Amino acid sequence: MPKAIRVYEYGGPEVMRFEDVPLAEPGPGQIRVRQAAIGVNFIDIYFRTGAYKSPHMPYTPGKEGAGTVTAVGEGVTQFKAGDRVAYGSVADGCYAEEPVIPASAAVPIPDGVDEKTAAAMMLKGLTVEYLLHRTYAVKPGDTILWQAAAGGVGLIACQWAKHLGATVIGTAGSPEKAELAKQNGCDHVILY
């Protein structure tokens, strides 16, 4: 029987329970994934502590992960058992050995990318894609300012913006973070 982290009440890390859970079969449009890695994000803490309310209790935390497809539901044609996938922006359930997720939330993992990297990139990467392409399409010659340039989203955003040809100004809270930001795409860093 697979295991999962379950939360029955809001609180600190002590409210998380590691439990046996039934192996769920994927429904229409869903896939089941044998987890290789998960991303741990502040949003998981917000839900666990009750800062954001879960739509149901108990629940399994987690919004992104990566692994191998073990089963596909009706109508799923883009994946088959054995495919390596990463996924993000699911309602919850990633802190599990074999979660069932919407196939539409998954993407194939390219050769040369390991599951740990893929799992850690999904929510942060989707956030950056949204900001640098949909909110404002960054183009060569633009100058952008990125707050918290050495944070998880900031490190991806600064590299991506630099790749797009922008001049990147980042902010950081320490000399060490400023150096990290410079190593990851910032042309200039403001210490605060």
Model-derived regions, located:
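Cytochrome P450 core scaffold surrounding the K-helix E-X-X-R motif
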Residues: 43-49
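Hydrophobic/small residue at the entry helix of a nucleotide-binding pocket
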Residues: 152-153
